[in-house]
């Protein structure tokens, strides 16, 4: 039982590391999202300014660039959701492992107490 408790604790440590890595990854992706959104907003403003100056060619160019960025933003949002789902799944597994380890330790303690009483 001691060996399996140690193995479970190693699994728990690895799961926590993996979760931390996913969280760092998703934070990085969220920063990408923020930058993309800022660029999209700038292209919207540039488009409005070009329309006011009646420069349709520039306005069309800005709209095209904005749409390309919007597509990247949509892909980024999908990546964030995918990572968030992985994080949630890992957190559930971590909780399950913590409960299982706790039960195993309690059982070990109970058996040790019985052994002491029996002796």
Q: Language model features by range: what are they?
A:
Residues 1-19, 61-119:
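Long, charged alpha-helical scaffolding segments
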Residues 15-30:
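Short, charge/polar-rich alpha-helical segments
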Residues 30-77:
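Extended, amphipathic alpha-helical coiled-coil scaffold segments used for oligomerization/tethering
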């Amino acid at each position: 039982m001691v060996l399996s408790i140690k193995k479970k604790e190693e699994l728990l440590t690895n799961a926590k590391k993996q979760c931390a890595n996913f969280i760092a990854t998703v934070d990085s992706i969220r920063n990408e999202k923020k930058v993309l959104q800022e660029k999209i907003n700038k292209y919207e403003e540039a488009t409005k300014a070009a329309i006011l100056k009646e420069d349709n060619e520039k306005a069309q160019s800005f709209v095209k660039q904005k749409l390309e960025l919007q597509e990247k933003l949509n892909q980024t949002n999908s990546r964030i959701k995918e990572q968030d789902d992985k994080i949630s799944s890992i957190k559930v597994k971590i909780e399950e492992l913590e409960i299982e380890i706790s039960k195993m330790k309690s059982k070990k303690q109970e058996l040790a107490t019985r052994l002491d009483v029996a002796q």
